[in-house]
């Protein structure tokens, strides 16, 4: 996906969470289990509730692609900014800035849903064929003694002394673990400590991949998947905010790095929070 990132002009076929990802799940399942539908894969791999969310997202993206072909009068897979108004209108969205934003927001959210479940399912389908990881991504894996969401956050915090990625099995645990309907005092205290880690970005990225960013950081809720039609921003607000946090933790300019290192731990944590929420 390095060529087609999840930006403001996503490629519905080749990009993140696109049809290639969904088709890969289907074909691996077809070869291994001789099924004609992802839904018919073993329940140990495909949870019914997860499949429903996946299918709703996929059906919506199929409709978007059909409308995109009609508007562009060719087999166009990239949802360019100039095509969004016409495509949105074909799909019965209000012909207004708000209508276009609602449409683009749903596209981004749907692509993230496909990315999440295809990542988890492809790993589950191919686990018997895995070889030693040589990607250098420093994956973290689920722990058997994890009982609740607070335990998950603590594990993320422990690993955030260096950059890491959440393994697909960890993403599965993230979305499946028991969570209170609303954050409680214990969770708020733990979330606060995440900002003090040198690689807080890795934590927030894992939560974003699991579509739990809005749950864990409530102020970001209104801007998750929100498009920015200003000609300057390349990504939805939450992805842009994550990128900002990444660059704050990976300062390359020596003078700015000196200023950063001169801050106290409390000041660094506060600045991370301000940077992450600057567009809220």
Question: Where are the model-predicted features located?
Answer:
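Core mixed alpha/beta domains of very large multi-subunit molecular machines
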Residues: 219-223, 240, 254
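Amphipathic alpha-helical
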Residues: 233-243
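Short amphipathic alpha-helical face segments that pack within enzyme cores
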Residues: 154, 243-244
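Short, surface-exposed loop and linker segments with low hydrophobicity and enrichment for Pro/Ser/Thr
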Residues: 141-154, 255-270
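Non-catalytic interface/linker regions that flank or bridge core catalytic/transmembrane domains
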Residues: 1-233
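Hydrophobic alpha-helix feature that most strongly marks membrane-spanning transmembrane helices
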Residues: 27, 246-249, 253, 276-279
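His-Asp-centered metal-binding catalytic motifs of divalent-metal-dependent phosphohydrolases/nucleases
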Residues: 22, 64, 207, 244, ...
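Histidine/acidic-rich helix-loop-helix segments that form or flank divalent-metal centers
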Residues: 8, 227-234, 248, 253-266
């Amino acid at each position: 996906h390095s060529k087609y990132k999840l930006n403001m002009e996503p490629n519905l076929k080749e990009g993140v969470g696109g049809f290639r990802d969904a088709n890969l799940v289907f074909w691996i399942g077809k070869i291994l289990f001789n099924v004609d539908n992802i839904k018919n894969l073993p329940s140990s791999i495909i949870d019914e509730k997860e499949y429903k969310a996946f299918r709703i997202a996929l059906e919506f993206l199929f409709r978007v692609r059909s409308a995109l072909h009609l508007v562009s009068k060719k087999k166009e897979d990239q949802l360019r900014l100039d095509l969004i108004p016409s495509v949105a209108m074909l799909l019965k969205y209000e012909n207004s800035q708000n209508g276009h934003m609602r449409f683009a927001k749903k596209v981004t959210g749907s692509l993230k849903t496909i990315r999440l479940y295809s990542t988890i399912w492809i790993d589950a389908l191919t686990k018997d064929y895995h070889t030693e990881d040589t990607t250098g991504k420093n994956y973290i894996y689920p722990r058997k003694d994890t009982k609740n969401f607070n335990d998950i956050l603590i594990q993320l915090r422990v690993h955030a002394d260096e950059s890491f990625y959440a393994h697909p099995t960890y993403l599965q645990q993230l979305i499946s673990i028991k969570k209170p309907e609303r954050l409680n005092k214990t969770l708020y205290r733990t979330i606060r400590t995440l900002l003090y880690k040198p690689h807080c970005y890795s934590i927030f990225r894992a939560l974003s991949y699991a579509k739990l960013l809005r749950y864990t950081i409530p102020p970001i809720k209104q801007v998750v998947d929100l498009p920015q039609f200003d000609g300057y921003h390349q990504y939805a607000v939450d992805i842009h905010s994550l990128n900002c946090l990444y660059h704050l933790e990976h300062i390359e300019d020596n003078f700015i790095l000196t200023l950063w290192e001169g801050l106290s731990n409390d000041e660094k944590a506060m600045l991370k929070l301000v940077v992450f929420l600057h567009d809220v």
